Every structure is written in structure tokens, then in C-alpha cells.
Amino acid sequence: MQQRRSVRRALLSVSDKAGIVEFAQALSARGVELLSTGGTARLLAEKGLPVTEVSDYTGFPEMMDGRVKTLHPKVHGGILGRRGQDDGIMEQHGIAPIDMVVVNLYPFAETVAHVGCSLEDAVENIDIGGPTMVRSAAKNHKDVAIVVKSSDYDAIINEMDANEGSLLLETRFDLAIKAFEHTAAYDSMIANYFGSMVPAYHGESKEAAGRFPRTLNLNFIKKQDMRYGENSHQQAAFYIEENVKEASVATAQQVQGKALSYNNIADTDAALECVKAFSEPACVIVKHANPCGVAVSASILDAYDRAYKTDPTSAFGGIIAFNRELDAETAQAIISRQFVEVIIAPSATEEALKITAAKQNVRVLTCGQWAQRVPGLDFKRVNGGLLVQDRDLGMVSERELRVVSKRQPTEQELRDALFCWKVAKFVKSNAIVYAKENMTIGIGAGQMSRVYSAKIAGIKAADEGLEVQGSAMASDAFFPFRDGIDAAAAVGVSCVIQPGGSIRDDEVIAAADEHGIAMIFTDMRHFRH
């Protein structure tokens, strides 16, 4: 596949003009003739580059407010013409070969993201000529290079310099794949946008349209292949979204350690998303996608120390997430105390990285600071289908809570209740979390019976010698019977926070009153499966 093709003529037509002037200058300096359209042509001419307008080349003017510019046989014949096979017909019709096409498309995604975007604005930002040229050039990659990403400009010039103005077939093939990926993603955005409008377009309520198109098209970019998946007999890869707007495991930079495994990534995501729920310095330790210790404190060192005390056994081989910079003192405490798979934080000091580097198996990730949580979609694959829902970004404030018991919670109980309510959201259902003084003291996760989750949380607290008396308990969903309250009271829980909504709420509240427990309803459930 070493077949080279010289680049003598290039057509440039871009919406995103970042780097295009420099790229065009580099091409022109290497003897490449430049064709261009509209705003791109004007920009290049203003910079003193010798550029021919496509309309001058075709003898046919741009028309219909720019809707028709490049849809012409002299353009597409020059792109699609097979060298050595179609030369005669091209010469007969005055069609010059075009060796490179540089195109990126109208900013459809950016346009429809604007609040108040009209249907007319969306329609006018559907590119027609651009994708047509992109697909034509990609189809004929044997003879033509198609460039859709400005990040490829420098590499292309370097390869031309190394090959006497030519590009290798391997490069043209790779560029063609990128082009097809580019147009596929572009068409998917358009289909998703208009697909979600179908009910409203036919006169139904605006709410009926929602955010779920009738056909869901997804585009993810492969970040890395994995050694294996959740188990060693499964193959796997990690795909990420383009232009992720929130600090995440997908955008994190690995600054130390061996390659992340499938389970590392899944657990790191669980830990990071949980720690992002807290504004105070916080530490979350996760094992098998469940928090096994969470704490907030004045420093991340103390937060880590207290989170670890929740369940040291489960913390072994876990994932640790912080919402503040990893410092040397905290790094030393972790390395000295336990085996850890991954540490993730917004950043890490040089001293901290020197300490963690002493353990080659420790992976350290930095994800940057996050300003806010970004709405999006969650997916769950089922056999033959895909469940899609909004991300669970719901969280109640203190003023939204309802005290339903006779006894009001104390200020400390209220703080502990809100703390463990945040944690419970990230624990697999049925989820029960005991907390006291801003640290978890027992977590019961993933049980089929809510009362058993409550019992397990109590057992874990007892195993670690943690004082449950006067603690708060959070439940991710309502208590269907009073037995969960009785179990909590038996170990000393004094405040319960839960969604409420059971047909037996009265019995559950009565149980709380019998035990002198303060009970708070959130009116919001946080199932996690």
C-alpha cells in the first residue's frame, strides 16, 4: 500500500477556519494550486494567497444565498475521476483533477444548541455541498486526500515534505475513514435533532417531542482497546464522546501507572461521580462500583482517613477519588496504608506523584476541576435494545425536605442526613447508608430486601467498631414496611432520610415515632441498578 499521489491542486471550503490560512500557505508554498469558495476564498485572498474561486473555475456562479456552490460536474468530476481510467473524459469536458479536498461542515450542532434556535436556522445550517464533496473524495481515496480535521494539517504537510509533495495510500485511506466518520456523525446529529421534533411537528404538545428521537444515532470515538472486558474471556474497548463538557473519566489524563482495565474505568467513573456531589473537601473509596467509604472534612487527608475507616477490608484494591488536588501528605498516607488500583483527583502535586511513583501498579489520573454537572443521557443495554434516560442529577436542598415524624432532627442530624442522602444516590439499590459527623459508618448495597441492606450496614459499622448511636440513615427508596426502621433503631440510628411514597408510609412513620427517630422525606427516589 505504498502507492503515492502528488498533491497539485486542492479545494478548500471550511466553516471552522482555525489553522486554514497557515495550511493553505504551506500548500501554496509547495506549489499546490488553491481552489476555494465563499468566505474561505475571501479569507485566503485577504492574506495574499493565490486562490481561484470555484465559481470562476466552473463558470457557474454561487446562487440561492450560497446553497449551490460546489454541486457541479467540474468539481465532482475532478474529485471522483479515476486517474488512469477517466483521464480522457475529464480532458474532453475540461475537468481538472482535484488531488486534495479540505472541508469541514456547517456548525449544525452549535446552531441547534442555542436557546431559541428556530427551525429555519437549523435547516439553513444543514450542509449539502460539504458532505457531498467529503464523501466523493473519501470514495476516491485511491487518488484523492480528504481532510476534515484541522488537527491533521501539520502531519499532512510533514508527510508531503518527506515524500516529494505526495501522500501515501495508507494516509489517504486513514483520512477517508475519518471523513466517513465525520459525515456519519453530522447526519446523526441532524437525524436526532429533527427526529425528536416529530410529535410537535405534527401538532402534538411541545412536551411530547421531549429529547428522545424516534431513531437514536450515537457516535463515540475509540480511546483505547482493553486487554479484556469485565472478565478475561470478554473482549473490550473504551469509547468516549466528542467534546465532553464536564470533567470525567473520559477526559481524565493518566499521569502514572499501567493501562487502565475495563473494571478500573467503570469503578473510577463511579468514584468520581460520587465525589463530585460534594463541595467540601471529600474522599470517596469505591469497590465494584459501590462506595465503601465516603467522608468530607477540612482537608483531603482527614477525609481520606475517615473514609478508609468505614470499611478498610473493602478499601483494599479500591479506587480513591478526591475533589481537591492530591497532595504529598495524602499520597503518602494512601501508599503506606493500602493497596490501591486508581487515584483520581482534579490535579496532583509533583511531590505527590513522586510518592505514588514508588508503587508502579498505582494508576494516577487527573481530571481537572469541574464547575457544574452537565445534563446528558444514560444508557443501559438490554438484549435486543437500549434503555435511555436523563442523567440522575436530581438532589434536594434543605428547604425542600419534609419532616414527617413527631420529633424534629437536630442540626447535626440534619447535616448527617443530607450527607448520607448524597452518598446513597451512588450506592446500588437497595441502598442503605449510615453516617455520622460527615463520614459513612456503614453501607448496605445491592440487596434484594431493603431490611437486609439496613442490617448489613449495621453489621459493617459494628465490625469496624464505629459508633452508630445517634447516626443518620439514608435509603435510596421508600421503606415498604416498618422492619427497616426497627432494624435501624436496634443499632442506635436516630434520624432517617428517605423518599417516602409507600402505601404504608403511615406505619413507617409510626415506627419512627415509637423509637423516637426523626424522619425526613425527600420526595425524590434514587434507584441505581
Curated annotation (Swiss-Prot):
GO CC annotations, alphabetized: cytosol
MGS-like domain boundaries: 1-148
GO MF: IMP cyclohydrolase activity; phosphoribosylaminoimidazolecarboxamide formyltransferase activity
GO BP field: 'de novo' IMP biosynthetic process
CDD domains to which the protein is assigned, alphabetical: IMPCH
EC number in record: 2.1.2.3, 3.5.4.10
Catalytic reaction(s) noted: (6R)-10-formyltetrahydrofolate + 5-amino-1-(5-phospho-beta-D-ribosyl)imidazole-4-carboxamide = 5-formamido-1-(5-phospho-D-ribosyl)imidazole-4-carboxamide + (6S)-5,6,7,8-tetrahydrofolate; IMP + H2O = 5-formamido-1-(5-phospho-D-ribosyl)imidazole-4-carboxamide
InterPro entries: AICAR_Tfase_dup_dom_sf (IPR024051), Cytidine_deaminase-like (IPR016193), MGS-like_dom (IPR011607), MGS-like_dom_sf (IPR036914), PurH-like (IPR002695)
Pathway in which this enzyme or protein is active: Purine metabolism; IMP biosynthesis via de novo pathway; 5-formamido-1-(5-phospho-D-ribosyl)imidazole-4-carboxamide from 5-amino-1-(5-phospho-D-ribosyl)imidazole-4-carboxamide (10-formyl THF route): step 1/1; Purine metabolism; IMP biosynthesis via de novo pathway; IMP from 5-formamido-1-(5-phospho-D-ribosyl)imidazole-4-carboxamide: step 1/1
Record carries keyword Hydrolase: yes
Positions of disulphide bridges: none
Domain of life: Bacteria
Lyase is among the record's keywords: no
Assigned keywords, A-Z: Hydrolase, Multifunctional enzyme, Purine biosynthesis, Transferase
Sequence similarity: Belongs to the PurH family.
Domain topic, free-text comment: The IMP cyclohydrolase activity resides in the N-terminal region.
Protein name: Bifunctional purine biosynthesis protein PurH
Organism: Salmonella arizonae (strain ATCC BAA-731 / CDC346-86 / RSK2980)
Lineage, opening ranks: Bacteria, Pseudomonadati, Pseudomonadota, Gammaproteobacteria, Enterobacterales
Gene: purH
